Amino acid sequence: MAGAKEIRSKIASVQNTQKITKAMEMVAASKMRKSQDRMAASRPYAETMRKVIGHLANGNLEYKHPYLEERDVKRVGYLVVSTDRGLCGGLNINLFKKLLAEMKAWSDKGVQCELAMIGSKGVSFFNSVGGNVVAQVTGMGDNPSLSELIGPVKVMLQAYDEGRLDKLYIVSNKFINTMSQVPTITQLLPLPASEDDDLKRKAWDYLYEPDPKALLDTLLRRYVESQVYQGVVENLASEQAARMVAMKAATDNGGSLIKELQLVYNKARQASITQELTEIVSGAAAV
């Protein structure tokens, strides 16, 4: 019964792992609900900022802010939002693949790329593949604050202000639902003109008091910060949803494996009993 004992040991090991994955699934489900609440709370502000900025980009302004002007593209920057922990399926790698494809397209045109990383998985991945990481922040936990994100955002905005970057993008996972998270790359600077037909029809004229430059400087920076924060909270909700689904799949696979091992164990035990009975019958016949 040495084989049967080994199989019993494997079954116990899988059962222990199954308990862990089930617990992780339940924790991820709880965290996902909290992350969804934060995401829903921040969305109205981010969407309103996007609408106001869309009007600005479409309007004929008395002062043309540098963030509104297109440049010849020689260098682009990416704010990349990844997770700090793993066990969330292909969430990170799908995002990185999409970004690598876009970076290759820029590279083919002779354009260089700079990366500001949010999340340790992105830092380790792009350090290993040779990405030009100029800023990073990790370990923000499950309740990130805007103050924690200011570092990488400030580095990229300063590079844009000094003309060292000609475009700035945010790369993150957009939360659609529990089963679907979509890797997205969204242009932050220069501000893209809105594609919303309603905004194009209802152009706004602005009167600035006291000074359009000071007001636009503050407003446009707040816009970038709001979009980055929204990207982070959506990515966090995506992470918890992906982890919950991955752990459920692992738990289900563990159940299937246990059934297979149980069947193998029963066959091994049956074979052992049959062999013992055969030996007893053979011994009795010999007597």
Curated annotation (Swiss-Prot):
GO molecular function, one term: proton-transporting ATP synthase activity, rotational mechanism
Membrane topology: Peripheral membrane protein
Pfam families given in the database record: ATP-synt
This protein's UniProt keywords: ATP synthesis, Cell inner membrane, Cell membrane, CF(1), Hydrogen ion transport, Ion transport, Membrane, Transport
Keyword Transport applies: yes
Alphabetical GO biological process terms: proton motive force-driven plasma membrane ATP synthesis
Subcellular location: Cell inner membrane
Domain of life: Bacteria
Keyword Cell membrane: yes
One cellular-component annotation, GO: plasma membrane
Family: Belongs to the ATPase gamma chain family.
Purpose of the protein: Produces ATP from ADP in the presence of a proton gradient across the membrane. The gamma chain is believed to be important in regulating ATPase activity and the flow of protons through the CF(0) complex.
Quaternary structure, from the entry: F-type ATPases have 2 components, CF(1) - the catalytic core - and CF(0) - the membrane proton channel. CF(1) has five subunits: alpha(3), beta(3), gamma(1), delta(1), epsilon(1). CF(0) has three main subunits: a, b and c.
HAMAP family xref list: ATP_synth_gamma_bact (MF_00815)
Protein name stated in the entry: ATP synthase gamma chain
Species per Swiss-Prot/TrEMBL record: Salmonella arizonae (strain ATCC BAA-731 / CDC346-86 / RSK2980)
Gene name of this polypeptide: atpG
